[in-house]
Amino acid sequence: GAFTLGLPSTGIHSNGYSLVRRIISDNHLNLKETYEGFDKPLGEVVLTPTKLYPKLVLPVLKGADVKGLVHITGGGFYDNIPRVLPEGTRAVLDADKWPLLPIFSFI
């Protein structure tokens, strides 16, 4: 059978900033404050640079029979993964298998 490979997020990426700005504003959060669970101020946490993945993905594309790739953006797993699956197939994901970055629990 086939398997699903996920690459880790480094934090809030470009499509998430509008929502994060609203959450910060609505909750009167201080971007200069270091909140529990972080080792730097919130402003630095949310501005962690977006990781680019070519160095990880290109060797996989060259060495495996890749059936599909999906960029998880707005809509998350549930809206994005089905777009690359052949009709009649499904992906089974176990959310307990990957760590949740503190910023996502915080917001």
Model-derived segments and spans:
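Phosphate/diphosphate-binding glycine-rich loops and adjacent basic-rich segments that engage nucleotide
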Residues: 1-33
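Glycine-/charge-enriched secondary-structure boundary and capping motifs
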Residues: 30-107
